[in-house]
């Protein structure tokens, strides 16, 4: 099933698949928003090769909600209770900084991706869950004053029991944004290859050999920016995974 965002892909060219051996400073494996963002920043300073097994901005990056927020459900009270206030504060500040970084990239690179500042809400229609939301709001307030507030109404045509309203959040079109990053990467004299599935990575004489489509990319550094680590050893992550699906309306 294709997401609403992925309909936009037809307006962008397909990058060629890798066809020969090559050398680079950094090889980024994975063409989602994480891989593209990593390659974007690195390409300003060094040569980068990005490899994507399918099309860039597919799967998770092409099917997300388009939210650019530090509001991730009812989460911060749990984070404070389980990891401590200082850890939770660093997590919140990192997410808020990420919002500002994306805003700067969109502005500086003139990426047309429908970026817009918005409020973000987490709400409930159940009176029994109101106290949980109020505790969450107080928890966030301990980390950053005036970032959010508890409200009884939201900007949607529905009855609610209560909500937390986060200020200074945003939304964008993830596929348009991803292809905007890709254009910047190529303009920085780095390379992107689609339909180029990495099958193995070996370290030989201090370098990394990345094997893909019967070809080899030799790199000083490798960044694995895939949904999960695809190298079986030592983690055997494929044995620890479970399937999860969510939907947004």
Regions found by a protein language model. Give the residues of each.
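Helical element adjacent to the flavin cofactor pocket in flavoenzyme catalytic cores
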Residues: 138-143, 163-221, 225
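Central beta-strand plus flanking loop segment that forms part of the substrate or channel wall
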Residues: 68, 72-73, 118-123, 238-249
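Glycine-rich FAD pyrophosphate-binding loop
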Residues: 43-63
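Flavin (FAD/FMN) cofactor-binding and adjacent substrate-gating region
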Residues: 1-8, 74-81, 104-180
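N-terminal Rossmann-like FAD-binding beta1-loop-alpha1 element of flavoenzymes
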Residues: 22-50
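Central helical "cap/lid" subdomain
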Residues: 214-249
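Glycine-rich active-site loop/strand segments that organize a redox cofactor
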Residues: 59, 63-94
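Extreme N-terminal leader/targeting segments of oxidoreductases
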Residues: 1-26, 44-45
């Amino acid at each position: 099933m294709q997401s609403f965002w992925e309909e936009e892909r037809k307006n962008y060219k397909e990058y060629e698949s890798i066809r020969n051996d090559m050398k680079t400073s950094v090889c980024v494996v994975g063409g989602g928003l994480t891989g593209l963002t990593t390659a974007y920043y690195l390409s300003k300073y060094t040569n980068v090769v990005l490899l994507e097994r399918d099309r860039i901005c597919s799967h998770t990056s092409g099917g997300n909600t388009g939210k650019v927020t530090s509001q991730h459900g009812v989460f911060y009270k749990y984070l404070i209770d389980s990891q401590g206030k200082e850890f939770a504060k660093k997590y919140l500040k990192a997410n808020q900084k990420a919002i500002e970084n994306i805003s700067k990239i969109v502005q500086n690179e003139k990426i047309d991706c429908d970026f817009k500042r918005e409020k973000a809400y987490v709400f409930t229609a159940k009176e029994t869950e109101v106290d949980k939301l109020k505790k969450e709001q107080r928890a966030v307030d301990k980390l950053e004053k005036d970032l959010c507030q508890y409200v009884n109404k939201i900007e949607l045509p529905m009855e609610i029991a209560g909500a937390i309203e986060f200020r200074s959040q945003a939304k964008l079109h993830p596929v348009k944004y991803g292809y905007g990053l890709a254009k910047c990467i190529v303009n920085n004299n780095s390379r992107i290859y689609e339909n180029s599935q990495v099958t193995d990575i070996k370290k030989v004489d201090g370098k990394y050999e990345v094997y893909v489509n019967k070809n080899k990319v030799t790199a000083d550094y490798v960044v694995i920016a895939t949904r999960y680590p695809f190298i079986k050893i030592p983690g055997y992550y494929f044995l620890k995974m479970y399937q999860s699906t969510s939907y947004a309306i």
